[in-house]
């Protein structure tokens, strides 16, 4: 949810399959970065080492896999799981013997909504793996007393997704035993994981919030993978959304969907910082039904309002071509997508592309496809 400046936001309308949800998190800058394990903590000695579910299994409605799309605050595939609760609030406990290293409170204002405070908690079960919980609605009494006041290191407020956020964080060193109370959820809980032994590929690593850190965006992992059986299997059975289960490997989802020299993956408004994600574009696949292609559109294309636009991709041709096969520079591809839209797409170079929405209808004859002055370019 947060380290060195990624903020959580309670937003709605998650997922390209169209379910309106209370999606959580961020819209700030990058994922968990800049944090390291406490001194003296041993490296991870087994593949699975978490022995207790974060929340009772029966309190989980479903878990949205990695790679959720919810523009504009989450224009890019998200780097965390969303636990959606079957109850209004649920107790959160330590999933194993852990050391908490940071606690953050985030103040949300504006957007025509009541002001909201929620918390993130970062911990290490062993030195190789960092886990962070976002949207903790309230800290447990005993845990809060150990942490103390959260009014010291406060960042400047910043806007994203129609809200204004301010974060205040505190470095701590609090050991907890498996099952010890951390706090309670609201309707959702964000669960991030970073594993310094894992390396994921990005088309432009310079665009990462932390290109070199042991627990930055190069090291995104799935927290469920660290739970022992049968807990891990039970949690995996919840991966999906209401009415749909993710069955395509990797069932925990996929964050890094960049394919070099193709249209697939993350694209940036030229000259804009990586975060917030609002002005950017992702050409990806749905995190629950990955057979669906998705245009995840931020705020920079006047002809395509910020939203997700889905289509059934094909491996050849010039209509609805899977982004991973859009590799010919200068060739225009047409897409008939959801929300009664057509989209034109063209690779201008290996690191630059052009996009425009052209309204309803069939794609028709490629000889008629042409961009107007309203087309927008993005870069890797």
Give the positions of each predicted feature.
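Zn2+-dependent peptidoglycan hydrolase active-site motif and core
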Residues: 95-168, 189
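Short, compositionally biased
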Residues: 189-211
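Beta-rich strand-turn-strand
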Residues: 163-186
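C-terminal motif of bacterial Sec signal peptides marking the signal peptidase cleavage site
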Residues: 20-22
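Bacterial signal peptide processing site
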Residues: 24-27
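Bacterial N-terminal signal peptides that target proteins for export
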Residues: 1-12
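Beta-sheet ligand-binding and adhesion/scaffold domains
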Residues: 314-380
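Surface-exposed, glycine-biased beta-strand/turn segments
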Residues: 34-127, 175-178, 187, 212, ...
């Amino acid at each position: 949810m947060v380290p060195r400046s990624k903020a959580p936001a309670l937003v709605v309308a998650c997922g390209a399959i169209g379910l309106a949800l209370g999606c959580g998190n961020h819209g700030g800058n990058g994922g968990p970065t800049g944090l390291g394990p406490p001194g003296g903590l041993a490296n991870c000695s087994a593949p699975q080492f978490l022995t207790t579910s974060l929340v009772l299994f029966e309190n989980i409605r479903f878990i949205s896999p990695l790679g959720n799309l919810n523009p504009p605050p989450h224009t890019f595939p998200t780097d965390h799981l969303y636990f959606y609760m079957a109850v209004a609030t649920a107790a959160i406990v330590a999933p194993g013997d852990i050391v908490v290293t940071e606690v953050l409170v985030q103040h949300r204002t504006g957007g025509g909504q009541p002001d909201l405070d929620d918390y993130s908690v970062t911990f290490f079960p062993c030195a190789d793996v960092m886990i962070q919980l976002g949207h903790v609605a309230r800290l447990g009494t005993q845990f809060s007393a150990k942490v103390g006041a959260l009014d010291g290191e406060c960042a400047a407020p910043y806007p994203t997704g129609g809200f204004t956020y301010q974060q205040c964080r505190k470095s701590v060193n609090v050991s907890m035993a498996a099952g010890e109370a951390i706090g309670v959820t609201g309707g959702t809980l964000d669960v991030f994981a970073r594993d310094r032994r894992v390396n994921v590929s990005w088309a432009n690593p310079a665009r990462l919030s932390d290109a070199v850190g042991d627990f930055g965006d190069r090291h995104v992992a799935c927290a469920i993978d660290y739970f022992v059986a049968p807990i891990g299997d039970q949690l995996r059975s919840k991966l999906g959304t209401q009415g749909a289960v993710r069955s395509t490997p990797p069932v925990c989802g996929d964050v890094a969907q960049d394919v070099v020299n193709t249209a697939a993956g993350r694209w940036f408004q030229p000259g804009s910082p990586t975060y917030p994600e609002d002005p950017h574009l992702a050409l990806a696949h749905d995190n629950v039904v990955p057979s669906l292609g998705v245009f995840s559109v931020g705020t920079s294309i006047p002809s395509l309002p910020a939203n997700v636009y889905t289509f059934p991709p094909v491996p050849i041709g010039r209509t609805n071509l899977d982004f991973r096969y859009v590799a010919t520079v200068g060739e225009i591809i047409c897409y008939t997508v959801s929300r009664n839209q057509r989209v034109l797409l063209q690779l201008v170079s290996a690191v630059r592309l052009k996009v425009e929405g052209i309204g309803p209808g069939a794609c028709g004859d490629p000889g008629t496809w042409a961009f107007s002055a309203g087309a927008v370019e993005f870069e890797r």
